[in-house]
């Protein structure tokens, strides 16, 4: 492998939506950085069977429903 072309690979802490934490190696951030997840396997409809609502960040879902809700597909 060529020297100096690969990103730094270090330990970070990942915080899940329910507050559980684990450490893993990543190229994201810097050594000791904390990654707070907004959606993970415990809150994403693909893994929960669609029983939970997605968060409406910035009103995007509301805006979409207001604009296209009356189509009645």
From Swiss-Prot:
GO terms for biological process: translation. PROSITE patterns: RIBOSOMAL_L31. Keywords: Ribonucleoprotein, Ribosomal protein, RNA-binding, rRNA-binding. The keyword RNA-binding applies. One of its GO terms (cellular component) is ribosome. InterPro entries: Ribosomal_bL28/bL31-like_sf (IPR034704), Ribosomal_bL31 (IPR002150), Ribosomal_bL31_A (IPR027491), Ribosomal_bL31_sf (IPR042105). Pfam families: Ribosomal_L31 (PF01197). The keyword tRNA-binding does not apply. It comes from the Bacteria. GO terms for molecular function: rRNA binding; structural constituent of ribosome. Binds the 23S rRNA. Belongs to the bacterial ribosomal protein bL31 family. Type A subfamily. Part of the 50S ribosomal subunit. This is Large ribosomal subunit protein bL31. The gene is rpmE.
């Amino acid at each position: 492998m060529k020297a100096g072309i690969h990103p730094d690979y270090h330990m970070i802490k990942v915080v899940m939506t329910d507050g559980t934490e684990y450490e893993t190696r990543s190229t994201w951030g810097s050594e000791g950085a904390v990654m707070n997840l907004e959606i993970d396997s415990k809150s994403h409809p693909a893994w929960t069977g669609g029983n939970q609502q997605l968060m409406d960040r910035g009103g995007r879902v509301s805006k979409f429903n207001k604009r296209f809700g009356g189509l009645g597909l």
